[in-house]
Regions:
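Dinucleotide-binding Rossmann-like beta1-alpha1 core, especially the glycine-rich loop
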Residues: 46-124
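Glycine-rich FAD pyrophosphate-binding loop
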Residues: 20-45
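Mid-domain catalytic core of redox enzymes
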Residues: 22, 227-343, 364-368
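N-terminal Rossmann-like FAD-binding beta1-loop-alpha1 element of flavoenzymes
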Residues: 2-29
């Protein structure tokens, strides 16, 4: 066999689909679950689709990616939305990102935030710190840091935030005192919009239906319920938990590296580094009541609440009702035992954590693997917090390179 693809999430499906479109027939996809889609799967809950891996949408910003995907769910089957995401600060709701929407706060709070921003290290030209917590404080000022950024990131990623690096925060813009002041005077947001400022969501189904369409196109090229646990870099094969062996000239891995129990032929020091990769696990749980809001998702930095985010399904899934919460696994115990959700699902691998030293580990790992014709791809193959549209783009690029 020419190509073996591990995982039938967006990354694996994209590579397999592109190979087939190019006339390649000697390939196979191995999937642990009984259906394709990975974190982007959907389930019917209370009569409408719910995205079990959390909030996943199709960004409008990559037309070539969307053109590729619309072959499996035509453009006319999607609605397009302008993102409405909000943050709940105590009893107030402010649009996300907070630093661009200080003007929505009461005037007394605007003044406090403005003073804090003026004293941020990046605005005083003080040296850039090395630790995550102090870097955030240097970049955004004390108020945004303490009221939102630190408590929210603790809820979604880790209680010990300084295990995170700062190398992935460069995309955060400096918070300008002058621009924030002008924003407050004009009652208008400033700066660039976050990802998914505009997004597509299916009119009649969940996001998972897109990936099912790709899986249907691949047909028997996907084998389900195969839990790969061993990879042999010498013999170019993998073994499943059931003992089945699959061989290929090129192996494309899109599953978490920590899912492997054994790495034959890999240096022990590199195997040890893989064990240092970290991730967070997220539970989604559905509640049938509607929220009185136009927001599609709401961020909750309040540390007394277990969940960090609510997705308001009725505001992007036509005709539906209800909402779902997203909660880091370690905080699920904070829910009252009296609260019995109609549906819950836990994603063990939800977010790869950008820990100190991670980028060096991944660079060394991927470079070594490529020398043995094994390629890491996607959120888990590259251990990067990629959204599905980015994953598809990278999958298409990899096929071109191969």
């Amino acid at each position: 066999m020419n190509y073996l693809i591990l995982g039938a999430g967006p990354a694996g499906l994209t590579v397999a689909t592109k190979l087939k479109q190019r006339g390649e027939d000697s390939f196979l996809v191995l999937e642990k679950e009984r259906e394709a889609g990975g974190l982007c799967r959907s389930a019917m809950v209370d009569g409408y689709p719910l995205d079990i891996g959390g909030g996943h949408f199709l960004d409008v910003r990559r037309p070539k990616v969307n053109e590729f995907l619309f072959r499996f769910m035509p453009k006319e089957e999607w609605n397009i939305y302008i993102r409405n995401s909000q943050i709940k600060l105590n009893d107030l709701f402010v649009h996300h990102p907070l630093e661009a929407n200080i003007w929505e706060l009461p005037e007394n709070l605007q003044k406090e935030y403005l003073v804090s921003i003026s004293n941020a290290g990046c605005n005083l030209n003080t040296p850039m710190p090395d630790t995550f917590v102090e870097w955030i404080r240097w970049k955004l000022g004390d108020r945004i840091t303490d009221d939102y950024m630190l408590p929210y990131n603790q809820k979604i990623f880790s209680d010990t935030l300084n295990e995170l690096g700062t190398y992935w925060l460069d995309k955060l813009p400096n918070v300008s005192y002058e621009e924030t002041l002008e924003s407050c005077k004009k009652h208008k947001a400033y700066g660039t919009q976050p990802g998914h400022a505009q997004f597509y969501y299916p009119k009649k189904t969940g996001y998972g239906e897109l990936w099912k369409g790709m899986a249907d196109y691949l047909g028997n090229k996907i084998i389900y319920n195969v839990n790969v646990k061993r990879i042999n870099f010498v013999e170019k094969n993998v073994n499943s938990l059931d003992g089945d062996c699959f061989h290929a000239d090129v192996i494309i891995n899109t599953i978490p590296w920590k899912e492997f129990d054994e790495f034959i032929g890999m240096p022990e020091e590199l195997v040890d580094k893989i064990s240092k990769l970290k991730h967070s696990s997220i539970e989604t749980r559905y509640f049938p009541h509607d929220l009185d809001t136009e927001a599609q998702w709401i961020y909750y930095p309040d540390s007394t609440l277990p969940y960090h985010r609510i997705l308001v399904r009725s505001n992007f899934c036509m005709g539906s009702r209800g909402c779902w919460t997203e909660t880091r696994k370690e905080r699920v115990c904070m829910f009252s035992e009296k609260i019995n959700p109609e549906f819950r699902f836990e994603s063990e691998y939800a977010y790869p954590l950008n820990t100190v030293g991670k980028q060096e580990i991944i660079k060394e790992l991927l470079n070594w693997c490529e020398k043995h014709q094994v390629y890491g791809l996607g959120r888990w193959g590259e251990h990067q917090h990629y959204n599905s549209d980015v994953v598809v783009e990278r999958g298409l690029k990899l096929v071109d390179e191969l």
